[in-house]
Amino acid sequence: MILKKLICLAAVMLFFSFASYAYAGSIGDEPGTPGKWFKGEEPVQKDESKPPLVFVHGINSSSATWFDRNDMAKQAVLNGYESAFIDLYPDQDTKKNGKLLAEKLKEIYDVFGRKLIVIGHSKGGVDTQSALVYHNAHPYVEKVITLGSPHYGTPLADLAYSKGGSWLAEILGQKSDALYSLQTGLMAAFRSETDKLEKFPHKYITYSGSEWGTFGGVLYLGGMYLKSFGANDGAVTVSSTRLSYANNILTGKWDHNSIKNGTSMFPVFQHQLLANAASAEKENIESPNSTELNTDVYVKGGESEKEKTEAFYVEEGTNGLSIQWLNESQEARPEIIAPNGDVLTNLKTSEASFPYEGAFSHHVQINKPVPGKWTIRSNSGKKAPYLLLVSFDSPLNDEIKAEAAKSGDDASTHSSGLIKRLSKKVETFYFKDAQKDHPLKTTASSADQLKKEGAYSVTVHYTGLTASGTSAFNRTVIRTLYVDQDGNIHGDIPY
């Protein structure tokens, strides 16, 4: 009888111990319900001097990212930290996620009874700052650690909303408010407003990665495209992960996935958890906004017929090529025809990564390619979207960049020492929202088109001849710009 009473008493106590945060969910819940959060496993010995850790996931993700093939939650427990894990909207912008996160941070703060340290991966770091600055969550948070967060957006989002890249992204269902908000022009506008309102700049600690794997790896697509923008982790450039006023602690040999791995990262940022944020070492950085053009890629995309043929030019002196053909089919591998008639069919196929999850990348690297007109041919058997990305390792890249920067709005054709002729064509699309675009009149100088408030995807096609007059070349520059309600243009104008 006494044993039964003890069991009943224990059950009642257990019920009430969970009741205070039962609304938050539990580890056994199906992950991915926006607004649900749960406490992590309790450490053997609680230490009230250690702030609770709140883990926030990124775009197209959920709280499961900290558990699935990841021991971050375990590392927190082993090191004596209480923790909480939250699910935000995987496909919503920083405004909506920031509001939701602010509400939940107050709940979590009330449960633990002391200030929190928020650890945000990727867009989760941006959502966290939105919660603090725009939705008054600062009182609940001691500091914020961001892991590979695109504080200035990512050119991969620009690519997904460009004329060439949007077809495939839309068919794959990747175009969302979340991806839309990460375009560099929109994030430039976000930074312009947010940085002025940030009252506690020393709360932020950033970490970044500079690895994106080897040829054919899961982050190879993003890394190859981003390399002309600088060091990157396969999804975000190092410069974008840094804030001018934050404690930008370290850039390490992590990619965008491994930077959230517990074994890799917890020992790295552990000493920052108890450090005074205002007194932490701060790395001096240059402005993340680079006005340089990335002139080492050629981009073409759209919707193909059953058979699709695209052509591009390789100039003399090119050291190497990286060719990627993205489509929905693992089997529909393209063939590449060199100017001398050689046919390449041994392309490697792998699953594509952000922002083209669900697609397949068929790719090949070519050393010392034959100069001239190259052709890539694909037979999908049906109408299907595709995206062609060609990266050039060429001495001409810097020359094109320098000459393109000189061209200004009034010049569409000019020459230099290594270039006989350089021409450009500008295509501009206006976005009313994350799903709909509206083409604007194409002109060589389209700055005067940027009048209406909203986002503008600008694609600049460069074509020309080298000094010999016999070798053609082509490049593509893509940027998203944002015009605010006062007519201010945010982002790098690529012409």
Question: What is each residue range found by the language model?
Answer:
Residues I27-G32, K39-R114:
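Active-site catalytic motif of lipid deacylating hydrolases and related acyltransferases
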Residues N60-S61, P90-D91, P150-Y152, E211-G213, ...:
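Short, solvent-exposed loop/turn segments at secondary-structure junctions
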Residues F360-I366, P371-W374:
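Ligand-binding face of N-terminal immunoglobulin V-set domains in extracellular IgSF glycoproteins
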Residues I2-L9, M13-S62, N79, E292, ...:
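Flexible, membrane-associating and regulatory peripheral segments of lipid-active enzymes
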Residues T65-A84, K106-R114, I119, N247-T251, ...:
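Elongated, non-catalytic scaffold/linker segments and compositionally distinctive motifs
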Residues E198-R333, R377, K382, E403:
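C-terminal catalytic-base region of ester-bond hydrolases, centering on the histidine
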Residues G25, L53-H57, S83, K95-D195, ...:
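Serine-dependent carboxylesterase/thioesterase catalytic core
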